[in-house]
A protein has these predicted regions:
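Short C-terminal tail/terminal secondary-structure segment
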Residues: 2-4, 103, 153, 232-233, ...
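Conserved glycine-rich cofactor-binding loop
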Residues: 12, 19-21
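Conserved glycine-rich Rossmann-like NAD(P)H-binding loop of the short-chain dehydrogenase/reductase
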Residues: 35-49
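The beta1-alpha1 cofactor-binding region of Rossmann-like NAD(H)/NADP(H)-dependent oxidoreductases
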Residues: 44, 65-77, 111, 226
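Catalytic loop of short-chain dehydrogenase/reductase
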Residues: 97-98, 111, 142-167, 172-181, ...
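Substrate-binding pocket helix/loop in short-chain dehydrogenase/reductase
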Residues: 102-106, 110-118, 212
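C-terminal helical subdomain
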Residues: 181, 188, 207-243, 250-252
Length: 258
């Protein structure tokens, strides 16, 4: 990813849900751009491979215990990153409910599932924004949410996931207006990419994954590091200094009317 080289050099970024999938790929891309990358994970040992990716790409990895449903943990992760590296330039909230890996018909959903999705996606989106705001204001930084096409057009057997991702999109639009005068940009990326959820689906319903892939004009699902990472880095860099309040759909052409 030579095009990213130096794009975030001297910058400090927090990526939540960085242990696997899109989060791992995005973290590696920020490493390739020269950033210090805080890897927010529930279990620090789970971030070992991601940390290696970041370091090999040319960045600096900082593993942080950061369960985004725990207010004290997320606050401590942000403060540790700032204390050790002096600043915070971007937050990428990528963490999702572990139950997003499950395809569930609406009639089989329950309140516990809803609360889990809401806690990780909606409440944590607000909480991370609140906790990072003074640091992002100091650096004229960026707040990036990892949304989903499901939050725009809906997804069968994922009603709660679709709902919370739609809420994130509205949050982006509102917060971009409010934080703009402070120099903070707020955007989201809606990727169609290889993820733990799709990997699980490939085992349980391979024909469904084949149908999804067949609908992508570019003929494949996105790679988290090389397809989703660069647009995410761009939106957090000075190259996107006049872009805010937007959702960038990165889907290989699958979703062209969103």
């Amino acid at each position: 990813m030579s095009g990213l080289e130096g794009l975030m050099r001297g910058r400090v970024v927090l990526v939540t849900g960085a242990a696997a999938g899109v989060g791992r790929g995005v973290a590696a891309a920020f490493g390739a751009a020269g950033a210090v990358v805080g890897l927010g994970v529930r279990r620090p040992e789970a971030a070992a491979e991601t940390a290696g990716d970041v370091e090999r790409a040319g960045g600096t990895a900082v593993v942080l215990r950061c369960d985004v449903t725990d207010a004290e943990q997320s606050a401590a992760a942000i403060e540790q990153l700032v204390a050790e590296h002096g600043r915070l330039d971007a937050v990428v909230h990528n963490a999702v409910s572990g139950r997003s890996n499950e395809a569930t018909d609406f009639e089989h959903t329950d309140l516990g599932e809803w609360e889990d999705h809401a806690s990780v996606t909606i409440r944590a989106t607000w909480r991370l924004a609140t906790q990072s705001y003074p640091h992002l204001r100091a650096t004229s930084g960026a707040y990036l949410l990892m949304s989903s096409p499901a939050g725009i057009e809906g997804s069968e057997r994922a009603p709660f996931y679709s709902a919370v991702k739609a809420a994130q999109r509205g949050f982006v639009r509102a917060l971009a207006r409010e934080w703009g005068p402070d120099g903070i940009r707020v955007n989201s990326v809606a990727p169609l990419a290889i993820s733990p959820a799709l990997e699980n689906l490939a085992v349980t319903e391979p024909e469904r994954v084949a149908r999804i892939t067949a609908l992508v004009p570019l003929g494949r699902l996105g790679d988290p590091e090389t397809d989703i990472g660069p647009p995410s880095v761009f939106l957090c860099s000075d190259e996107a200094r006049y872009v805010t309040g937007q959702t960038l759909v990165v889907s290989g052409g699958r979703f062209t009317g969103l």
